[in-house]
Structures are given as structure tokens and as C-alpha cells.
Amino acid sequence: ASGGSVPAISADSYYRKVCSRKTLRAAWRVVYSNGINSDKEETRRLVKEFSIGIETHLERIYRQLLKGKFRFPPSQGIPIPRKGKKPRPLVKSPIQTRVVQRAILEVLQSAPALEPYYKNPTSFGGIKGKGLGVPGAVKTVNEAVEAGAKYYIRSDIDSFFTKIPRKIVLAKISGVISDHKFECLLEKATDVELDNLSWLGSSASLFPSYEVGVAQGCCLSPLLGNILLESFDKQLNGRGITCIRYIDDFVILGPDKHKVQAAFKSGLQILAQHGLTAYDPKLSTDKAGMGEVRHGFEFLGCSVRPGMISPARKSRRRVVEAVKTVLDKSLVLLDQPELLMRADLAAMDTLASVANILEGWGNQYAFCNDREVLKQ
């Protein structure tokens, strides 16, 4: 059961690597950086509060792990509304849980024996290393197009994280990393126990159950997903077909419609073995699509055409709306005389906010080569 204690540790184990002060401190730095830069005010507040007396907190976690007494407190399920879609089932865990989960991730990613299970040249999401992430994925798509791909199918694995067969993935890891104490800690770190199930009501069914699913919002979830889809990545590449995957989004490229559709069918069969499925590209929704490469297509927030990469129209519209929201808020001052004394300061804050939005968006799409779109 989640929250249970774990056995005492033995020497020279993966478990010992997790509970070293060095690993915990490195894990905290990542948790702090992610939290303090979050767009959620509550997340920033929680991280700031935890940072007060951080050495005391880390020492407590270290000693609890060392004695096998660390417990993962229950998390909260947050259904994030999405227009025209089911809510996104985000799991918000306490800071100490995030620190230990991040420490476990650091140890897993530093285990050479595990790399063949998740480091594939066409998989880019949730993998530590240079040239990965969205830029690496989109650039590889563009390379396949320039190499002669004529047809594509893009799709999204439906409810991926909440349907991952966790026990199967943990068994794969156990087959490579022989350390019972570490395996026990990993199982508890990836279990999802929510303390607000009654509040969630009907939305509770969107969240992971005991054996199926991992938490959206947990740093370990992308790695577990990549390990599960090892065979998907390997079997869908070759014989003229390229399949680029970023977590649950993927695009299949090939020389003609027949071969690409056959590859997609094979992919569905592989996913079905794990109780997963992908959206139907024939419906041409935001989640999936198919067609000739020469007409262009969207993938990971980018528009890809032969030799040209640019931010997708939806992404461009989103940044304009973000700037407009900031400007609209500043205009409230003009209608409230009692706030006019602060107008100069507010104007500076507004300009700084707009600059930050544009800089962040520009950095996000700096790898795009369609300069005309970027100038707009």
C-alpha cells in the first residue's frame, strides 16, 4: 500500500544512491527550479516555504530513507478543465515526495543497464540528454521529410499515463536492476494515493488506480512510459518507415500511404497488447491526422512543411492572447482613479510581463527556421 515504510538498506545498492545527501540535494535543486518558475502561484509558494530550512528538511528525508522509514504522504487529484475534452487528471504531490521521486529518477537515468529500454533514437520526451525534447523531435521529423518521406500519420495515445500498466513496467525495471529495497521504494513512489477522492466525485475515475496508471505531474511517469513503449519505438522504425515519438504524441512518415497506414496498424496492435489505443487519423481532429507531407502538418506545436519549420497557428494565437490579457489588465487602471498614482509602476510591470512572455515564446521556438513567421 502507498505510504508504507520500506526495508532498511544494504551497502552498495541503488537504494543507497537514492538516499545519499548528494543525490537528494541535486534532486531538490531541480524541484526548486521547476517550482519557482511555475505559472501556478500556489506551487511557487509551497516551494518557497519548503526552501526555508531546506538543509533540515533534506537531512530529515535522508535519515528517514536511511532507516527505511520514509513514507509518501497522499497526493491531491486536480482535474484541469479542457475545452471540449475530458479534464486532465493532474496529481499534485507534497514537496518531499517530489524530492524523493526526482532522486529516484536521477538514479534510474544513471543506470547504464536500463538505457537500452528507453533511449531510442526516435524517442525524445522525458529523456535526459542533449538534442532531445521538442526541438530534437521536430528536427528529426524535418530530416525524415527532407530524406524523401511523402506521407504521414500523426496521432496521440489516448489517456496514456492513466492507462500505463504499472506492474509490467516495474517488472521490466526489476529484471535489470536487482535491488529489492530500491524496487520497493520505486513501487511506492509511483503508486497514486489521493486524499481528496470524495471531493473529486465522478472525476475520480480519470485518475490512476492501484495497478494501472501513473501520475500526470510525477517526474517518473515519462520514463515509465518510455520503457513500456520500447518495442513500439523499435518495431515501427525501419524498412522505409520513420516513427518519431514524444511521450504520447507520435508521427509516422514513409514513402507512400499504404506503407504508412500499415505501420500505423502495426502500432495499434503493439499498443493494444498493453491495453492502449491511439486516436483515429481519419477523423482529422486536433489529436490525429493524415495526408501528404507536401501540404504540411502540425506536430508538437509546430507546423512542418518540406524544409520549413514554424510555430503552429494555435501557438501563435496563444501568445497573442497572453499578451492581450496582460494589456487588458493594465487598462483597468485608466478606469480607476484611485489607482492612477500607481500607473507608472504598473506600466513598467506590464511591459516587463509582455517582454517575459515574448522572450519565453521566442526561446521555445528558437529552433524554427521560418523567419518570416517569427517576425510577424
Name each model-derived stretch.
Residues 1-64:
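Non-catalytic, polymerase-adjacent accessory regions of viral genome-replication enzymes
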Residues 58-76, 185-191:
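An acidic intrinsically disordered interaction segment
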Residues 143-247, 251-274, 280-281, 291, ...:
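Conserved polymerase palm-domain catalytic core
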Residues 277-311:
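Acidic/histidine-rich catalytic neighborhood
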Residues 298-376:
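Active-site and adjacent loop segments of nucleotide-processing enzymes
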